[in-house]
Structure formats: structure tokens, C-alpha cells
Curated annotation (Swiss-Prot):
Keywords: Early protein. Disulfide bonds: none annotated. Plays a role in virus cell tropism, and may be required for efficient virus replication in macrophages. It comes from African swine fever virus (isolate Tick/Malawi/Lil 20-1/1983) (ASFV). This is Protein MGF 360-8L.
């Protein structure tokens, strides 16, 4: 059961406190990263207002790991009292005093890197991906990280796309992997987190959106001019993975070479993409007879998703 003091702090953290009273928040321990600690009214999330993150929601479990890496004992206790999971704390504790505090609060001893990595990503959620990132990133305890330990899991998720993340620095591989998983599973908060944290990986975000058929993220990248790639290169990337109808269609509408798309799909033996690209070629030549009909020149991702959700290429039906 939470103490009266803990409940009171939690209640205050959910209020909007005028700046002239911030000194009271500091005195009460409701202060972190030079800002008041703000707690979401309806969920277990901290509202970040740092220079990097503007009004960004961060799960208490993630915030706790960040506090542990900072050796911020008061905040560690506070977040744990509020319900944050201390389970992975010892993996990130950098001093003996922090380690002892984590043990006292219930952290698990003896976890290995693979257990953490596989365990967290068994359920693909924004919180788990960001938490995994915070545990492994900038953590001197994990300097001996061996990327081969995670190779099977990474290959299972990325398949052919794994060749695009090869790097001599293990953490660079993992960051690209987490970003790719966020895009593959359309995890908006995780995508936002990586976009704000790793601005130099905007091209990687574009490539992942295309390859993993995330039409919503692709449209956002294109509309906001976050990254740019030659349209035919985009089309080639879309055709490398079967059933990428949405991103193939989007590239087609933007002017991608449909004959080249057919050739790339054939080269990669993506049968359904071949049939779909042939339908798009028929659409371009106004000879398409499939039902439901493909519509030309749509760039709204919701309309594209609805149009193609149950779409079967004409050529595959005629086999």
C-alpha cells in the first residue's frame, strides 16, 4: 500500500503548478532533469519537457532506468514507489551505492544481455523498445556487448534487410534494429522517440517505412520532407519484400518506374508484388478490369490502406 506521502506527491505531480511555486516542488522531491516532475492523469507515464522532448510521454519504467543511470537516488525511490519496475535496475546501476539501492528495492541479480533483449522484445510495444534502448545505450557495464548473441532474433525480424544495419559498433546495430522494429510494428511513440533522439537516422527511417510497408510513416516523412530518396530507389526497396502493396502503390503515384518495379520483384522472386505491379501497369494504361478497382493518384495513407486492405492482384486471381 502506498504511503500518504507517496500518494500526496503523486497527486501534486498530476497538477499544473505555476512557476513561482516550483521551489516547493524542488523541496518535496518532485524535480528531475531541471524540470518539475509531471505525471499523466490517466496513465503511468511521465510528461517530459526537456530540450530534446517537448511534452513527450515516457513510461515510468523507462524514466526509472534513466534515473538509475544518473545515480539519482531520490528519484529512483520516488518512481519505484509510484509503481515503476526495478527488475532491470542492476543492469544499469553504475556505482555500488546505486546497486545496493536497487537490490533493496527489488532489482533482479544475474540477468544476462540476451535474457533482457529477448525478454523485453517478446511483446513489441513502444515502452518495451524504448526501455530496451535505455538499458543498453550508453551503459559502460555492457561494453563487452556481443551482437552475435542477438543475431538470430534480429535476422528473424529483419530478414534480408539485416544487411543494411551491419556495423562494427554493436550499439549502432541495435539502435537501427529498435528503430526498424518500431516502424515495422507501427509503434508511434517509439518512432517519435527515435526520431527526436537520432536525427542523423532520418534516411534509415525512410528506408524502414518503405521496406516494412508502413504507408502512414512514409507519407509523414514525404509530406514533412524529413528525408529524400530517388523515387525509383524507393520503388526498388518496396519491391524487395512481398505484399508491400501500399508502399509500392505510393511510389507508383509519385512517379516510380513500374516496369523497373516488375523486374525488381521478379529478381527477388516476390510473386505477389509481380502481380500487383502488373495491375498498376494496367491501371496506368487504363486497361485494368479487377474488382475492386485500383484508383489512380491517391496519396492519403488512410485511403490507400482502405483500398488495398483486402486487395488481390488480378494476375494472381487468374492463375
Amino acid at each position: 500500500m502506498l504511503s500518504l506521502q507517496t500518494l500526496a506527491k503523486k497527486a501534486v505531480a498530476k497538477q499544473s503548478v505555476p512557476e513561482e511555486y516550483h521551489y516547493i516542488l524542488k523541496y518535496c522531491g518532485l524535480w528531475w532533469q531541471n524540470k518539475p516532475i509531471s505525471l499523466c492523469h490517466y496513465c503511468n507515464y511521465i510528461i517530459l519537457n526537456s530540450t530534446l522532448f517537448k511534452r513527450e510521454l515516457l513510461h515510468l519504467d523507462v524514466a526509472l532506468i534513466m534515473a538509475i543511470k544518473e545515480n539519482n537516488y531520490d528519484v529512483i525511490r520516488l518512481f519505484t514507489e509510484w509503481g515503476a519496475n526495478i527488475y532491470y535496475g542492476l543492469t544499469c546501476a553504475r556505482t555500488e551505492q546505486t546497486q545496493e539501492l536497487c537490490r533493496e528495492l527489488g532489482a533482479k541479480d544475474g540477468l544476462n544481455n540476451k535474457e533482457i533483449f529477448i525478454g523485453l522484445l517478446r511483446h513489441k510495444t513502444s515502452n518495451n523498445i524504448i526501455l530496451c534502448h535505455e538499458i543498453f545505450n550508453n551503459n559502460p557495464i555492457l561494453e563487452t556487448l556481443n551482437i552475435q548473441d542477438f543475431g538470430e532474433e534480429i535476422h528473424r525480424e529483419l530478414k534480408f534487410f539485416i544487411f543494411y544495419i551491419l556495423d562494427n559498433v554493436p550499439i549502432n546495430v541495435l539502435v537501427k534494429y529498435w528503430y526498424a522494429i518500431a516502424i515495422k510494428y507501427k509503434l508511434k511513440r517509439a518512432i517519435s522517440f527515435f526520431y527526436q533522439t537520432y536525427g542523423h537516422l532520418n534516411m534509415w527511417r525512410l528506408m524502414c517505412a518503405i521496406y516494412f510497408n508502413n504507408i502512414f510513416d512514409l507519407h509523414e516523412i514525404y509530406e514533412q520532407k524529413i528525408a529524400h530518396m530517388d523515387i525509383d530507389e524507393m520503388m526498388q526497396l518496396a519491391c524487395m519484400r512481398d505484399y508491400n502493396f501500399s508502399t509500392i502503390y505510393y511510389c507508383f503515384v509519385l512517379g516510380g518506374d513500374i516496369d523497373q518495379a516488375i523486374n525488381v520483384s521478379q529478381w527477388h522472386h516476390q510473386t505477389n508484388n509481380i502481380c500487383f505491379c502488373k495491375d498498376l501497369k494496367d491501371l496506368k494504361q487504363n486497361v485494368l478490369t479487377a474488382r475492386p478497382l485500383l484508383l489512380p493518384n491517391i496519396t492519403d495513407p488512410k485511403k490507400i490502406y482502405t483500398m488495398l486492405k483486402n486487395y488481390l492482384p488480378t494476375s494472381s486471381n487468374s492463375r
